[in-house]
């Protein structure tokens, strides 16, 4: 009986040892994988993700984007401002068509109301980028109201890894769920001053992108803010190939 009991105990101990061994290996694997994941979201990791922003910033001739993005691209801009105590946005949406090689879209001036939230398009026009002329409205009489500038910010603003590393970082974030990341810098820039009609004022420049392992495309938004007085965003997105 004692021998039988001892044999059973030995078998139980062996099973427990195997279970413990399996758990230990799993923990080691998880820790190893975790070390790789932990780098995601760090300042250096985010800076690496945004390093290809120099692919667009600057691009003096927007038509050159067709060479960089053969499947076409989208350009979006948004300005928020107040006028006579009312809130407005100027929204620009354009598409670089790979077939026609044209960059066309529309620009709208929209009245914004909060209670309840409501958007009212007050003025709108088709817009096209024409080389040597810049952004040209179909309704030229609305140019002053719909086009504060007749060119894109990315035509003038230079952003690259070396330049960004010299800037003060205000904030950064990364979402494991969505893959969305952003890094926010504080600085004064002549091209931004000229584009947004500022006077050597420090602004925050927020670069936003989305990380994915598959079907990687260029996707960056640049958001410029100054307290509550200024909000401007410009987004360039590469179209996916079929």
Residue spans of the language-model regions?
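Sec-dependent N-terminal signal peptides of Gram-positive bacterial secreted proteins and lipoproteins
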Residues: 2-4, 12-40
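N-terminal leader/targeting segments and the immediate start of mature chains
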Residues: 31-82
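Generic short beta-strand segments
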Residues: 76-81, 110, 184-192
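Extended lipid/amphipathic-ligand handling interfaces
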Residues: 90-98, 205-212
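An acidic-aromatic
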Residues: 93-148
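Flexible, processing/modification-adjacent segments and terminal tails
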Residues: 128-177
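Extended beta-strand-rich segments in extracellular/periplasmic secretory proteins, especially
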Residues: 159-211
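Acidic, serine/threonine-rich low-complexity disordered tracts
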Residues: 201-242
């Amino acid at each position: 009986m004692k021998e039988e009991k001892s044999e059973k105990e030995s078998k139980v101990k062996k099973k427990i040892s195997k279970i413990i061994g399996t758990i230990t290996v799993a923990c080691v694997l998880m820790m190893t994988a975790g070390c790789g994941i932990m780098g995601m979201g760090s300042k250096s990791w985010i800076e690496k993700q945004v390093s290809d922003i120099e692919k667009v910033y600057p691009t003096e001739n927007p038509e050159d984007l067709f060479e960089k993005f053969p499947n076409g691209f989208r350009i979006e801009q948004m300005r928020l401002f107040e006028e006579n105590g009312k809130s407005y946005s100027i929204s620009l949406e354009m598409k670089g068509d790979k077939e026609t090689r044209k960059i066309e879209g529309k620009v709208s001036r929209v009245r914004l109301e909060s209670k309840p939230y409501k958007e009212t398009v007050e003025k709108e026009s088709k817009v096209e980028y024409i080389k040597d002329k810049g952004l040209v409205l179909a309704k030229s009489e609305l140019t002053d109201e719909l086009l504060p500038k007749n060119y894109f910010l990315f035509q003038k603003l230079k952003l690259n890894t070396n330049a960004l590393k010299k800037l003060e970082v205000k904030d950064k974030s990364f979402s494991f769920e969505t893959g969305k990341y952003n890094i926010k810098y504080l600085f004064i820039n002549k091209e931004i001053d000229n584009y947004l009609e500022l006077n050597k004022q420090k602004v925050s420049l927020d670069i936003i992108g989305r990380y994915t392992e598959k079907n990687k495309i260029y996707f960056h938004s640049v958001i410029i803010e100054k307290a509550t007085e200024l909000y401007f965003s410009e987004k360039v997105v590469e179209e996916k190939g079929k």
